[in-house]
Amino acid sequence: MQSVKLGVGDKIMTQESSSWQQIVAKYQHPQRLKSIWQLVNTLIPYAILWFLMVQSLQVSYWLTFVLSIIAAGFLIRLFIIFHDCGHGSFFKSHKANFFWGYVTGVLTFTPYYYWWHSHAQHHACAGDLDHRGIGDVWTMTVEEYLKASRKTKIIYRVARNPFVLFVIAPAVLFLILHRLPTKEKGGRANKSIYFTNLGILGMAIIMSLIMGWKTYLMFQIPVVMMSASLGVWLFYVQHQFEGVYWERQEKWDYVTEALKGSSFFKLPKVLQWFTGNIGFHHIHHLSPRIPNYNLERCHNENPLFQNIKPITFFTSFKSLAFRLWDEQNQRLVGFDYLKQLKKS
């Protein structure tokens, strides 16, 4: 299969591109009523859960905690809507995508334009060993790790620790880093951060007037932290799994990356609903213009996708063992693999 490279960051199309493009084309059209219904069946239950959490404090904090877990699930679903708006796939209208992207960005504590810009780079570079570090999980090759300084090795081991990766890092990212403008992010991205911060401040003031600022923070911070942790876990499993595709830029192929470098995370139907079908990540990377509510149908209706081995809820936990990319053997390995290298 030969590839024609269009340049760094551009898609790489194969000779079979016309066939897969024809396959995905009919699923790329947003349907206004479906999008509106998705907003309704996500925003309204999320608001109701906030009301119930306030009322439940008079009964039991454990009941409040259970409700907050469900609320975190709805916040993940809101993030998927936010995500689709960023890809321009939720509505046909650019203005509608921008408006609802901003609104859901405030609710999910994520600046719309800044996130969209870095996420677009992720789509352009996912699975490319020469363009890591943009919108992805820090992953070193075995060779890079062995050549790294002791300090870098310690930092990397800490960064790849599951507690740091799925608890501390998501909280820092969504609660702190997404609030801070920098020169590196650029003017438009920083404006996005400023306006998102203003929106969050306005939301916090209104909610504090309704329920008190202590109660608001007692709900908001845990809900954001839980949804952020689960969201990062989803993202991790989508690109760090057994059999994943990584390649150097000169050999990197767009279609192969989508179908082999992005997982088919087959979740139970309830979890699939809360995560907005993002488990069909191979379809999403093949065509980010497909709305989340069309991803499953695209997968099920086309033979091209039927031989892709799914990752299940339970098998996904195998990904926790992966720490490094073994470039020589084209696979992810754990730190224990380094001990085997020393013995050999």
Predicted feature residues:
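Histidine-centered catalytic micro-motifs
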Residues: 78-87, 115-127, 234-243, 274-290
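Active-site-flanking alpha-helical
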Residues: 49, 86, 90-91, 246, ...
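Cytosolic juxtamembrane regulatory segments of multi-pass membrane proteins
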Residues: 253-271
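Transmembrane alpha-helical segments that form the membrane-embedded catalytic/substrate-channel core
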Residues: 72-82, 111-115, 163-177, 220-250, ...
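Membrane-embedded alpha-helical segments that form the functional core of polytopic membrane enzymes
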Residues: 56-82, 99, 103-113, 224-229, ...
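Short helix-capping and inter-helix turn/linker motifs at the boundaries of alpha-helical repeat units
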Residues: 14-15, 93-95, 133, 272-274
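Aspartate-rich (DDxxD/NDxxD/DxxxD) Mg2+/diphosphate-binding motifs
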Residues: 81-99, 124-141
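Non-catalytic, topology-defining segments of multipass membrane proteins
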Residues: 1-72, 106-221, 293-344
